[in-house]
């Protein structure tokens, strides 16, 4: 009988959740056969050199995220460390502005107030300092990783997490979408949704400083994304205990990036240093076909960054446009926004790309974006 036959929800599988079965999934070696282009494998995690990253490695990254280790690191993902420093300065200003009596941005999996958190740091950086944003997001490695897993039209958002000395660790977990539900809610969704959910999201992060393991770099359990009932299992004490006993951590240097499946068991670590304030810009990227966690004003972001796009390289400009504008033309109002000469109307990314190619002035772009937005409303 097919394993799917007769199952209508994950409730049918919860009684079969087994730590021994989980261990068989995760206690496997990561070999060069699964990541031949990697510069090294450390603690079961493939390590790549950003200087040599190209589109040819996309299939390899897909395999790692899908059925491989579930995580990889790109050293020197940012060639321009000045862009990291400039963005870090802006983020520190935002943290200072948002911190105040009675204010705490909170953390989904750690105590409120233990860390500094900037929600929607992508939009805040773009609107506050669009020149820094353009320089920062003109990063082909981030674009390649997102395209490798999600294809074009992806929706990128970021959140800054700054952990001061003494900052506590997160509880181990899986991430959005299903990871942000109670076990009872998770169990309402059928098995194929638990299989499909991780395909719709890519998690990642950019190191904004040198981060030794003692500063609390992310704790990871390679291959744990392969355990189907893992969203529910990750909430259970015996699985959390196993995670704490077997997880691995890697040091990161400023400009390194890490990418992993949202289904990978992971948790931010405790900052046990006396003098390292760990800052990471967390990246959460959704498929064009998925709902994102955060809402962004991508029209305002497109207008803010537009004057700075002409100075970028073609690949840098493509990366910034992909991170900024909406790449999927639906949902829309097909009475007012019908597809003409194709199957879909132009997306916001199409419009921003056309403006760059044809050298529009800012007023023309603003009018075109406003008209497009108006056509899409119900």
Language model feature labels by segment:
Residues 159-160, 204-206, 281-285:
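A structural signal for short, well-ordered beta-strand segments
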Residues 1-66, 320-378:
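Fe(II)/2-oxoglutarate
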Residues 85, 217, 231, 270-272, ...:
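Short conserved micro-motifs at the rims of enzyme active sites and ligand-binding pockets
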Residues 234-307:
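Catalytic core of Fe(II)/2-oxoglutarate
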Residues 6-17, 50-53, 208, 212, ...:
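Active-site environment of non-heme Fe oxygenases that use a 2-His-1-carboxylate facial triad
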Residues 80-82, 164-166, 212-214, 227-228, ...:
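Flexible loop/turn segments at secondary-structure boundaries
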Residues 16, 24-183:
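Non-heme Fe(II)-dependent double-stranded beta-helix
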Residues 144-145, 170-171, 178-242, 247, ...:
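Catalytic core of non-heme Fe(II) oxygenases with the double-stranded beta-helix
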């Amino acid at each position: 009988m097919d394993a799917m036959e007769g199952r209508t929800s994950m409730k049918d599988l919860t009684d079969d959740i087994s730590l021994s079965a989980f261990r068989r999934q995760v206690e496997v070696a990561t070999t060069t056969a699964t990541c031949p282009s990697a510069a090294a494998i450390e603690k079961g995690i493939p390590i790549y050199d950003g200087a040599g990253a190209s589109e040819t490695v996309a299939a390899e990254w897909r395999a790692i995220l899908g059925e491989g280790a579930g995580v990889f690191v790109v050293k020197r993902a940012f060639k321009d460390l000045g862009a990291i420093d400039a963005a870090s300065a802006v983020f520190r200003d935002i943290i200072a502005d948002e911190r105040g009596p009675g204010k705490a941005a909170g953390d989904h999996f750690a105590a409120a107030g233990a860390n500094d958190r900037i929600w929607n740091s992508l939009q805040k950086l773009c609107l506050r300092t669009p020149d820094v944003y353009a320089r920062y997001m003109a990063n082909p490695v981030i674009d390649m990783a997102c395209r490798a897993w999600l294809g074009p039209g992806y929706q990128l958002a970021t959140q800054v997490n700054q952990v001061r000395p003494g900052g506590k660790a997160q509880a181990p977990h899986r991430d959005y979408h299903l990871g942000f539900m109670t076990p009872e809610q998770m169990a309402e969704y059928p098995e194929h949704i638990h299989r499909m959910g991780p395909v719709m999201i890519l998690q990642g992060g950019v190191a904004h400083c040198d981060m030794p393991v003692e500063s609390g770099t992310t704790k990871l359990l390679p291959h744990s994304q392969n355990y189907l009932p893992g969203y529910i299992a990750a909430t259970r004490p015996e699985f959390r205990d196993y995670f704490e006993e077997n997880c691995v951590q890697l040091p990161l240097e400023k400009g390194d990036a890490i990418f992993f499946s949202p289904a990978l068991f992971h948790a931010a670590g405790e900052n046990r240093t006396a003098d390292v304030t760990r800052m990471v810009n967390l990246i959460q990227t959704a498929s064009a076909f998925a709902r994102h966690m955060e809402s962004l004003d991508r029209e305002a972001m497109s207008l803010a960054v537009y004057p700075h796009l002409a100075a970028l390289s073609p690949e840098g400009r493509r990366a910034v446009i992909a991170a900024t504008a909406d790449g999927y033309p639906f949902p829309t109002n097909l009475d007012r926004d019908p597809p003409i000469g194709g199957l879909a109307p132009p997306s916001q990314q199409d419009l921003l790309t056309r403006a760059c190619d044809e050298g529009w002035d800012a007023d023309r772009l603003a009018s075109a974006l406003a008209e497009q937005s108006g056509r899409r409303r119900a």
